Amino acid sequence: MTSNVNISVRSLVEYVYRSGSIESGFRTSRALTEGTKAHQKVQKQYGESDQHEVYVSAEIPYEDLLFVIDGRCDGLLMDVDGVTVTVDEIKSTSSDIGQIEEDSYPVHWAQAKCYAYMVAKDRGLSRMRIQLTYMQVDTEATRRFVVEASSDELEQFMLDVVERYYPYAQARYEHELGRNQSIKELSFPFPSYREGQRKLAGAVYKTINEGRKLFAKAPTGIGKTMSTLFPSVKAIGEGLLQRIFYLTARTTTRTAAEEAYSLLQAGGFNCKSSRSQRRRKSALRRKCGARRSIVSSPTAIMTELMKLCSIY
């Protein structure tokens, strides 16, 4: 039986083309905030026949897995001949745009080529033009690089990307099978629920199932941590969630969450976890010789957590 691997183009290429350093000009919270504006400024220059934010997808079978890959290309440009199609991938940066060369960021080319493959396959095109457009957010200066590729070359490129991603996808799939089985067999870690605990746990699961938000106020001592963590874990086993972020403002509440997680593990729960903390405390501990991840803002925290939690 073939199992599906659903993944976005960006997630796929960022894994395959990952490197040991991160270019801050593309990763800061400021760049993320201004990125949308930069994209819109470039897209306003498009012609009447051009399109922006075009959804594309493809299904690629490989070994025992079916890769369902999708994304949105920033621009789909039509040449004056009405035949040549260009995929435009826009990247905004706060760095010096003059320092960016054609081969500076292979991951950007990979993303654009994946989109080009999908467009060529969907429209039956034998050749595609691929363009990277960089915009400096302060000066609004732009720099473009253009290459061309045949549909056969793009197909081979796409297959190579999938082949390189496959070992991780297979390992993750096998892990998820074991994880979900452990969740199915997982029991509540206490002999009985405290007063109000079952009601809160039920509300948490229902909220997750309905894709809504829950704000709960409960007295101290009813077991709020386990009442939220346990149903959330069960929701992962049902395919309703992929990951859980448990954010706390104090060390004591963080410890409570870690202890609750340990109880679930002792009951057979098989899942990966990681911990990250704010810059100030991390920096203080770093001076004492301890190694910690250093993050500085809610956006940075979420980005760091997403990188750390590669298998769930």
Language-model region placement:
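Metal-dependent nuclease catalytic cores that hydrolyze phosphodiester bonds in DNA/RNA
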Residues: 1-79, 83, 106, 110
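Mg2+/Mn2+-dependent nuclease catalytic core
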Residues: 58-155
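Polybasic (Lys/Arg-rich)
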Residues: 153-185
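Conserved pre-motif I regulatory segment
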Residues: 174-217
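A substrate-engagement module of RecA-like helicase motors
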Residues: 180-181, 187, 240-312
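Walker A/P-loop NTP-binding motif
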Residues: 205-206, 225-240, 260-264
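Walker A/P-loop
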Residues: 209-231, 242-244
